Amino acid sequence: MEGITKSIRYALRKHGRDAALEDLRCFAGPPLVDKFMEVYGVTREEAEQLVTDFRERYVPIGVYESSPFPGIRELLEALRAAGKKTAVATSKPQPLAELLLERAGLRELFDVVVGSGGGVNNDAKWQIVTRAMELCGAKPENCVLVGDTKYDVEGARKCGIPCIGVRWGYAAEGELEAAGALAVAETVEEVKAMIKAGDSK
């Protein structure tokens, strides 16, 4: 989160704006161009320049200001040991998503990584998720999405798959429940238990 908010503020300051880091948490999750337009009322062209400026700091610096939540590696290893396919479906640009996973030492634990620009004509979350399922050869009834924002929950619903929300991410209090998450986990162990429970049905 820190890498994202600091890089958003860096971009804003280049354009004569400023904001407290806590007020910029809303930029974690949705497509940045859309969020800049929504929050600051800028044109698409201005928003695209803000995103360019964001990446000017985020790629060389911001990616090193975050780390995987404790237990994530072990969860992914357990899923793969059980024969599950794993995928990332993110609104981040494909190359940036790959870079973040490599930096975290997690890339080899995912069969598929799909980001915006990764073969998707429209960057809507549900289309990115659909593309990830296609590349995995998976059907909706055999999938579950684990996400930390309402955009994940909404994207999953449009694809006909359940979403397990996680409390340790970017969502505001009550956001995941209001969006319709199947359940909300407080810990990685709870996510693992929920996935296991789904397998038994």
Predicted regions mapped to residue ranges:
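Conserved H-loop
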Residues: 18, 43, 106-111, 139-140, ...
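Glycine-rich phosphate-binding loop signature in dinucleotide/nucleotide-binding domains
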Residues: 81-84, 136-142, 198-199
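Conserved phosphate-coupling serine/threonine residues in phosphotransfer and NTP-handling enzymes
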Residues: 90-92
